Amino acid sequence: MPHTVATPPPLLQVRGISKQFSGVVVLKSIDFTLQPGQVHALLGGNGAGKSTLMKIIAGILPPDTGVIEMNGQPCFNLTPAKAHQLGIYLVPQEPMLFANLSVQENILFRLPKHQADKKKMAQLLKNLGCHLDLSVSAGSLEVADQQLVEIMRGLIRDSHILILDEPTASLTPAETHRLFSQIRMLLQQGVGVVFISHKLPEIRQLADWVSVMRDGGIALSGATADFSTEDMIQAMTPEAQKGALTDSQKLWLELPGNRRAQSHAQSQQPVIHVHDLSGEGFAHISFHVQAGEILGLAGVVGAGRTELAETLYGLRPASTGNVILEEVNITAMKTANRLAAGLVYLPEDRQASGLYLDAPLSWNVCALAHDRQGLWTQPAQEAAVLERYRRALNIKFSHLEQPVRTLSGGNQQKLLIAKCLEANPLLLIIDEPTRGVDVSARSDIYQLIRSIAEQQVAIIFISSDLEEVVQMADRVLVMHQGEINGALSGAAMNVDTIMHMAFGEHRSASEPQGGTASSAENKGASC
């Protein structure tokens, strides 16, 4: 009688998982399987239920119904600590580090002594190609480096199931390549990876299997090679998205008391003129931005883009140089005065710096309002403002008093944009506006930014996604090691050229608006 070889059980099997919050169903009888050595990609629009499902698997939330099995054994009453013991580790979309602890302390936090192997940690860093200083405080790191620390926390715990929630959102192409190499090494050791991402090319490159969630259920699941990109997009967004904001949306989006309607609206002077500005992380920066122009700011992590943006907004001091906003020197102004003058900053980390997560939506959207006297104490006015942006930006929420942290990532980002617009900007600095948002929400945000520019607001657009920089910007400045390495426009503005310049290569470029093509030419000159 022939012997049959028993098929080993999946590393992880989820069956019939359901969940609701305050009567709203967010997961509908979900089935999900992860095999050893497999990358299972999870796609879905913001609010589809991806993060809720992963939090249940990681023991952060309890399911209402359903079963979770590891290696064929049911797991009951999961907690984060129990999930870690079982080898499940969730790397969150937004880094959740202890800002005042060192990088090393964060990686080893609450790790049993027999696992707290510093040599192993050093080897993992080497394998990842990281050059992190383990002694510095985690709060001093760029968002991309904070993300790598989170990943390290999972790797050093010998996780068998690694859940990566948008791990490459703030990584450069080189960092993404190193991360993927490390993931492939883990796969050879039998580790299973759940890979949540909105970057479809990455999913095709890395994932064996893909599942698409929509409205709390699984809309598509199977081998990645069996589905086209269009199949995945249609599964996420069943109704075709229009290419631009509707006339109704544009009407609701009209800025309150638009400063461009005032006497200086027809001025040919730049909205902002930065001359020979230096500060922590950058030096000798000069450029200008006209009304209605979208100026892209590209570069790898550590190039100084965010430091420059924070200095323009007054969060960091400038050591030399001048910043002129509408012919007024604001270099020595405090942040509040710059905001009142019309300079508004949308930060890259919406949860840490942009929104009050436990405050109501209606209060958040009015928090930066230029004239707030009595506004935040008048619920009717707050409600009217929020309703206007709900219609304009298609923000999805249940009620006005809903805490911000309960929104999906894409809706949080839209709310942050609404908060900035309510401040009535002359210049809007947008740092990583699509980090962690889905394909549909990205399209909404792109059209929104263009509509803002059409109202003659000047925009500085900072992004690590070079394709969206090329897609969105009228001109691009490329930063390398704190200086402008070149300025591009027109046909010269392409991903390949920007990439080479971001890594320090000098390339000639046509810049009809007075921009420069090298940092040497840029010093003291205006682009």
UniProtKB/Swiss-Prot annotation:
Residues that hold ATP according to the record: 44-51
Chemical reaction(s) catalysed: ATP + H2O + (2R,4S)-2-methyl-2,3,3,4-tetrahydroxytetrahydrofuran-[AI-2-binding protein]Side 1 = ADP + phosphate + (2R,4S)-2-methyl-2,3,3,4-tetrahydroxytetrahydrofuranSide 2 + [AI-2-binding protein]Side 1
Region of interest: Disordered: 507-527
Top EC class, one word: translocase
One Pfam family in the UniProt entry: ABC_tran
Compartments (UniProt record): Cell inner membrane
Membrane-topology descriptor: Peripheral membrane protein
Similarity annotation: Belongs to the ABC transporter superfamily. AI-2 autoinducer porter (TC 3.A.1.2.8) family.
Subunit structure: The complex is composed of two ATP-binding proteins (LsrA), two transmembrane proteins (LsrC and LsrD) and a solute-binding protein (LsrB).
PANTHER family: AUTOINDUCER 2 IMPORT ATP-BINDING PROTEIN LSRA, CARBOHYDRATE TRANSPORT ATP-BINDING PROTEIN MG119-RELATED
Name this polypeptide is given: Autoinducer 2 import ATP-binding protein LsrA
Highest classification ranks of the organism: Bacteria, Pseudomonadati, Pseudomonadota, Gammaproteobacteria, Enterobacterales
